Amino acid sequence: MIYWLFLAMAIITEVIGTLSMKHASVSGGVVGMAVMYIMIATSYILLAMAVKKVALGVAYALWEGVGILFITVFSVMWFDESLSLMKVGGLALLITGIMLIKSGTRKAAVKKSAEVVKQMANKAVSVATTKSSKIKEA
């Protein structure tokens, strides 16, 4: 659970960093650039912590995809950037792609878990058979 929180914080810091970059480029402020560097560095650190337990493909897709979604929304609200029908379609496809990646990872994780359980069961049967043979010999 904590790794998902790391991922959420990585997304938030990435969005703050990217929006700070835009703000600094519009206002010419040095503070915005400093905030950008700190937030983006923090974002990568948190992402690295998240991928210890969250699948890399899922983590990166969420980090980048959700980040783009929020950056687009805030850019329209705060920087008066346009939001065309084409951009809305792209964002919808992005969300769909993230959902597909996430659902595909769950199935792969379940399959991998099933394989591990099967291997453990086979090993247990092997050990039990060996011990049973030794008891019969005695």
Swiss-Prot record:
It comes from the Bacteria. Signal peptide: none annotated. GO terms for molecular function: amino-acid betaine transmembrane transporter activity; antiporter activity; choline transmembrane transporter activity; spermidine transmembrane transporter activity. It is found in: Cell inner membrane. It is a multi-pass membrane protein. InterPro entries: Small_drug/metabolite_transptr, Small_multidrug_res, Spermidine_export_MdtJ. Keywords: Cell inner membrane, Cell membrane, Membrane, Transmembrane, Transmembrane helix, Transport. The keyword Zinc does not apply. GO terms for biological process: glycine betaine transport. The chain crosses the membrane at residues 1-21, 30-50, 54-74, 81-101. Pfam families: Multi_Drug_Res. One of its GO terms (cellular component) is plasma membrane. Belongs to the drug/metabolite transporter (DMT) superfamily. Small multidrug resistance (SMR) (TC 2.A.7.1) family. MdtJ subfamily. Forms a complex with MdtI. Catalyzes the excretion of spermidine. This is Spermidine export protein MdtJ.
